[in-house]
UniProtKB/Swiss-Prot annotation:
Membrane topology: Multi-pass membrane protein
TM annotation in the entry: 32-52, 68-88, 102-124, 147-167, 187-207, 241-261, 277-295
Protein name according to UniProt: Lysophosphatidic acid receptor 3
Keyword field: Cell membrane, G-protein coupled receptor, Glycoprotein, Lipoprotein, Membrane, Palmitate, Receptor, Transducer, Transmembrane, Transmembrane helix
Compartment annotation: Cell membrane
Domain of life: Eukaryota
One GO term (biological process): G protein-coupled receptor signaling pathway
Source organism per UniProt: Rattus norvegicus (Rat)
Classification via Pfam families: 7tm_1 (PF00001)
CDD domains found in the cross-reference section: 7tmA_LPAR3_Edg7
Annotated GO MF terms: G protein-coupled receptor activity; G-protein alpha-subunit binding; lysophosphatidic acid receptor activity; phospholipid binding
Family in the record: Belongs to the G-protein coupled receptor 1 family.
UniProt topological domain (Cytoplasmic) ranges: 53-67, 125-146, 208-240, 296-354
């Protein structure tokens, strides 16, 4: 029968796996790392709070897509909490942690990643429902959106707790990984493969939607009335989503590949030398998202700017021309029916020309 090591400190597992815990991070180097990390985390808290507040206060954002976008910002906010906890429980401190505290540290990171990933999957479903039905926004009710958000967090919390629930190597030391010394290599393989598979599915779905919208926009543009900005609104919304997805994949894929190599017990891969850089890259994803939201949507930018300047928000104010016009229209406008009406007009024009 295998001996279990629940009562050991983490130095026992780090020493067995020869894991680098950055003992050299002392003095000036440690202060610089903590200062830079603190700055990024404060920005994550501030900017993602603005995104959530903007969706709540501005009625132009009261659509399923933007509720889910706010939930993605909440996942980034949670990631900031996970990174703060990591900063003060890493380096030389890592070896002094108890098993439960280390599992909490890693569980927070796993939960934040799963929440972001699951939320992007839900957004993919919402976008597919709306675009394939010729609408800018889906007809999901607030109740259904709320249930989807709760489902996202339930899945995220469960996935973050799986190692704590038993899928670890505390009773089978020979199965321990190197980067995560009390995670089983089998769990790392499962976790990374499932995430990479989800990445692939999302990319396929979004590329399919993007190509569909682009094709429809190109076909309908010569035959439809209305401003160019309104005709291109669906494409602009998809570009925002694709930019967020692209940033997520670029920031997280390298780290997941390294974890997969560790799970496969690759001895020649030198995974220890790159782990901190890929963790920093993952941190930058939560920094980038609010910047993407505000840059790609003028209404989001204006709402966030007014909140920063403590200016009153007038939801009835006339919008100014934007560098990239917002994709949101009022409910009394043709926003939700725009694509459907455009197709009808295009068909009429085609018949007339024939």
């Amino acid at each position: 029968m295998n001996e279990c090591h629940y009562d050991k400190r983490m130095d026992f597992f780090y020493n067995r796996s020869n894991t680098d815990t950055a003992d050299e991070w002392t003095g000036t180097k440690l202060v610089i790392v903590l200062c830079v990390g603190t700055f990024f985390c404060l920005f994550i808290f501030f900017s993602n709070s603005l995104v959530i507040a903007a969706v709540i206060t501005n009625r132009k954002f009261h659509f399923p897509f933007y509720y889910l976008l706010a939930n993605l910002a909440a996942a980034d906010f949670f990631a900031g909490i996970a990174y703060v906890f990591l900063m003060f429980n890493t380096g030389p401190v890592s070896k002094t942690l108890t098993v439960n505290r280390w599992l909490l540290r890693q569980g927070l990171l796993d939960t934040s990643l799963t929440a972001s990933l699951a939320n992007l999957l839900v957004i993919a479903v919402e976008r597919h429902m709306s675009i394939m039905r010729m609408r800018i926004h889906s007809n999901l009710t607030k109740k259904r959106v709320t249930l989807l958000i709760l489902l996202v967090w339930a899945i995220a919390i469960f996935m973050g707790a799986v190692p704590t629930l038993g899928w670890n190597c505390l009773c089978n030391i020979s199965a321990c990984s190197s980067l995560a010394p009390i995670y089983s290599r089998s769990y790392l393989i499962f976790w990374t493969v499932s995430n990479l598979l989800a990445f692939f599915i999302m990319v396929v779905v979004y590329v399919r939607i993007y190509m569909y919208v682009k094709r429809k926009t190109n076909v309908l543009s010569p035959h439809t009335s209305g401003s160019i900005s309104r005709r291109r609104a669906p494409m602009k919304l998809m570009k925002t989503v694709m930019t967020v997805l692209g940033a997520f994949v670029v920031c997280w894929t390298p780290g997941l590949v390294v974890l997969l190599l560790d799970g496969l017990n690759c001895k020649q891969c030198n995974v220890q030398h790159v782990k901190r850089w890929f963790l920093l890259l993952a941190l930058l994803n939560s920094v980038m998202n609010p910047i993407i939201y505000s840059y790609k949507d003028e209404d989001m930018y204006n709402t966030m700017r007014k909140m920063i300047c403590c200016a009153p928000h007038d939801s009835n104010a006339e919008r100014h021309p934007s560098r990239i016009p917002s994709t949101i229209h009022s409910r009394s406008d043709t926003g939700s029916q725009y694509l459907e009406d455009s197709i009808s007009q295009g068909q009429v024009c085609n018949k007339s020309s024939s």
